[in-house]
Amino acid sequence: MERMKKYFAHIWLDDFRSPMIPQTENIAWVKTYDEFVTQVKAFGKDISSCIVHFDHDLGEDKDGYDCAKWLIDWCLENDYGVPDYDIQSANPVGRKNIESVFESYWKVFFNKESKYEAV
């Protein structure tokens, strides 16, 4: 049986649902784009040891897709590794949009479909 990966922290991006992560984990619950940006910057280079749990619909102008695009750009600009991610959005179009941001990153920079594709 494979052991679950231990992360430095979980960033839970959702304006409605509370984190569905054991309370023994380091969790940052952010509900807006601005809170997300602030939290990611606070983690700095440690962001590459985190996992981000994305919701798409945040009830404001910017959504989870905007957060994903900003995260990839910020990691690239600062030469930080891109964190693992999970998408808990019930919005199928939003889910696919967020996935496409990460898929594009892996295709462009590593010529792979995803982080988990065999080399």
Predicted feature locations:
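Catalytic phosphate/metal-binding cores of nucleic-acid and nucleotide-processing enzymes, i.e., regions
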Residues: M1-V119
